[in-house]
């Protein structure tokens, strides 16, 4: 009986251990689901904001029938795309045609892994965080090129080639700007870069130490988002809809989602690299510095950090939306000349100057 009791207790302990493993596995997945839910809500808010801002710029009435103030218009559009027929080109490369949008969306979603939204609120604090973002974001144009090539349409293929050329042209200045920030912060981690700007509050932002790099990063990130005046890959007057021409239904909705996800990622990285991230702007003041032992206050501090990060990101969103609805589209030669003959030398010179100052200060 004693042996039987020991065996039963052992079995119960193993069953409890397995239960704990299952619970831990579910808890590990919860932050990912929370992040995906937050991203979905943010995209819906950005779509609504763009429609309201564009309506204000053009002096017209924006969406107002779908829900209060038109808040449900984006949900209605998404539902419509989900219910539409998924038409496949008869002579296209169907596997590549189906994979292209997924590659573009996944590459953008993976970028959120290294973005610190608030204090101690980041999925992966990696030592090469900013380089991982650059490497991952360079995968998205491959999906666009696959989509254009597999459509068996000259307009789609030309749009895919334009997307690849535009990404290559502006990825290099973007990388040089990130390298300059990493030299100032002595780290490639996004969390370390934010904490390096926290010493002097508003005056410690990299915006003041890297004004030229900030402007180059701003222009390059807008070009990476492929929005006006840099929307050459999908110019309606020239290419119908570019690489999206043959797409319909949910696949077309994925490309629509990529545009706003890319804009959100760029806004958050501008905030993290140049605007101090989650740090409050007033120097030498921490409202919760005396209450670090209280877990509730710690959670409140994290929530306020997320709010500050998103507020700064929405400033960049407002600028990008305003630029889209006020400036005309550039020609392809102007776009390439801006990237290779103007932004690239300036970003390289900025990196060399930053390196020189860092060596002198040692």
Swiss-Prot record:
PANTHER family: NADH DEHYDROGENASE SUBUNIT 1, NADH-UBIQUINONE OXIDOREDUCTASE CHAIN 1. NDH is composed of at least 16 different subunits, 5 of which are encoded in the nucleus. GO terms for biological process: aerobic respiration; photosynthesis, light reaction. NDH shuttles electrons from NAD(P)H:plastoquinone, via FMN and iron-sulfur (Fe-S) centers, to quinones in the photosynthetic chain and possibly in a chloroplast respiratory chain. The immediate electron acceptor for the enzyme in this species is believed to be plastoquinone. Couples the redox reaction to proton translocation, and thus conserves the redox energy in a proton gradient. It comes from the Eukaryota. One of its GO terms (molecular function) is quinone binding. It is an enzyme of class 7 (translocase). Belongs to the complex I subunit 1 family. The gene is ndhA. It is a multi-pass membrane protein. The keyword NADP applies. Keywords: Chloroplast, Membrane, NAD, NADP, Plastid, Plastoquinone, Quinone, Thylakoid, Translocase, Transmembrane, Transmembrane helix. GO terms for cellular component: chloroplast thylakoid membrane. InterPro entries: NADH_UbQ_OxRdtase_su1/FPO, NADH_UbQ_OxRdtase_su1_CS. This is NAD(P)H-quinone oxidoreductase subunit 1, chloroplastic. Its main location: plastid. It catalyses: a plastoquinone + NADH + (n+1) H(+)(in) = a plastoquinol + NAD(+) + n H(+)(out); a plastoquinone + NADPH + (n+1) H(+)(in) = a plastoquinol + NADP(+) + n H(+)(out). The chain crosses the membrane at residues 26-48, 97-119, 126-148, 163-185, 254-276, 296-318, 338-360. Its EC number is 7.1.1.-. It is found in: Plastid, Chloroplast thylakoid membrane. Pfam families: NADHdh.
């Amino acid at each position: 009986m004693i042996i039987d009791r020991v065996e039963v207790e052992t079995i119960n302990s193993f069953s409890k251990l397995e239960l704990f493993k299952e619970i831990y596995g579910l808890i590990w997945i919860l932050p990912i689901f929370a992040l995906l839910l937050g991203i979905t809500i943010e995209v819906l808010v950005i779509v609504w904001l763009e429609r309201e801002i564009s309506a204000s710029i053009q002096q017209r009435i924006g969406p107002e029938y779908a829900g209060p103030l038109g808040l449900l218009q984006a949900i209605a559009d998404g539902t419509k795309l989900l219910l539409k027929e998924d038409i496949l080109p008869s002579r296209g490369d169907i596997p590549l045609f189906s994979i292209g949008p997924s590659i573009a969306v996944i590459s953008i979603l993976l970028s959120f892994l290294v973005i610190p939204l608030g204090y101690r609120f980041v999925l992966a604090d990696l030592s090469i965080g900013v380089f991982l973002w650059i490497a991952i974001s360079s995968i998205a144009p491959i999906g666009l090129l696959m989509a254009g090539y597999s459509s068996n349409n000259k307009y789609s293929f030309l749009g895919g080639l334009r997307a690849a050329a535009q990404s290559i042209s502006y990825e290099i200045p973007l990388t040089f700007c990130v390298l300059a920030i990493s030299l100032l912060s002595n780290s490639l981690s996004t969390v370390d870069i934010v904490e390096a700007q926290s010493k002097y509050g508003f005056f410690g932002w990299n915006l003041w130490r890297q004004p030229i790099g900030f402007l180059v990063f701003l222009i390059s990130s807008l070009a990476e988002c492929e929005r006006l005046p840099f929307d050459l890959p999908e110019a309606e007057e020239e290419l119908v809809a570019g690489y999206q021409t043959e797409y319909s239904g949910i696949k077309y909705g994925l490309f629509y989602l990529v545009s706003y996800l890319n804009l959100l990622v760029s806004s958050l990285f501008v905030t993290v690299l140049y605007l101090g991230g989650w740090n409050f702007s007033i120097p030498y003041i921490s409202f919760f510095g005396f209450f670090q032992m209280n877990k509730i206050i710690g959670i409140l501090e994290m929530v306020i950090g997320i709010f500050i990060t998103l507020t700064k990101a929405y400033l960049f969103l407002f600028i990008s939306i305003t630029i889209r609805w006020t400036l005309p589209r550039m020609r392809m030669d102007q776009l390439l000349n801006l990237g290779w003959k103007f932004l690239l030398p300036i970003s390289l010179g900025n990196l060399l100057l930053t390196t020189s100052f860092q060596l002198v200060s040692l």
